[in-house]
């Protein structure tokens, strides 16, 4: 016993809904931190096609790793509708550091890098997010929850390949993307994205 009564937390919040929103926001913040850490480990100048591809891959990988390693926090982060849009504490940069904000920033960089055509940018974050989130749910509590780790890693690589193909600016570029053939999935995704940009002209 630590002398804390069950309803002590409510003293700091107006009601149960406000408390739940704060808990969900904190969980979403943990996910955002994991994604930001993955991006921070990627070198290269802003707008460099290879570096931009690596950053997008790092975001997706961090998302899946967090869902796998912190299933309780991951579920809590999405416990409320529209939770992805709720406030996450600022880091002093003024940037949107939410998971959705980081994905949008990575896609914007792909436009700057010449990999993703501007006319294809609007709204593309949602099908990409849906794809990665869907795999996270299938692997966490769905029919893929008991598959061997090696199989799951392969499915993750195929998911990234599918996303890369969705970013192709022309049908001819689709043939160059086979992320699963690379020994390093980050590097393979980056190579694929650079190739897509080269074939988009």
PLM region spans:
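Amphipathic alpha-helical packing segments from all-alpha helical-bundle domains
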Residues: 50, 87-115, 122-126, 154-164
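Helix-turn-helix
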Residues: 1-18
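Alpha-helical structural segments
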Residues: 1, 18-41, 58-65, 76, ...
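Short helix-capping/turn signature of helix-turn-helix
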Residues: 1, 13, 79-83, 130
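Short, surface-exposed loop/turn segments at secondary-structure junctions
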Residues: 43-53, 118, 145-147
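C-terminal regulatory/oligomerization modules of transcriptional regulators
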Residues: 139, 171-201
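Amphipathic alpha-helical segments used for helix-helix packing
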Residues: 68-86, 137-145
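Amphipathic C-terminal alpha-helical segment
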Residues: 66, 109, 129-147, 162-175
């Amino acid at each position: 016993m630590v002398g804390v009564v069950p309803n002590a937390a409510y003293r700091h919040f107006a009601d149960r809904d406000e408390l739940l929103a704060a808990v969900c926001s904190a969980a979403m913040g943990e996910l955002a931190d994991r994604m930001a850490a993955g991006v921070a480990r990627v070198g290269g100048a802003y707008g460099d096609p290879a570096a931009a591809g690596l950053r997008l891959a790092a975001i997706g990988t961090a998302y899946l790793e967090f869902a796998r390693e912190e299933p309780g926090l991951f579920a809590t982060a999405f416990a409320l509708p529209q939770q992805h849009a709720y406030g996450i504490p600022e880091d002093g940069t003024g940037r949107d550091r939410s998971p959705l904000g980081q994905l949008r920033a990575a896609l914007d960089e792909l436009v700057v890098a010449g990999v993703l055509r501007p006319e294809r940018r609007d709204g593309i974050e949602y099908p990409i997010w849906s794809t990665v989130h869907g795999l996270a749910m299938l692997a966490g509590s769905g029919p893929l929850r008991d598959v061997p780790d090696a199989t799951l890693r392969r499915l993750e690589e195929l998911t990234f390949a599918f996303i890369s193909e969705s970013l192709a600016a022309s049908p001819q570029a689709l043939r160059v993307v086979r992320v699963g053939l690379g020994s390093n999935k980050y590097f393979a995704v980056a190579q694929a994205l650079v190739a897509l940009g080269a074939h988009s002209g």
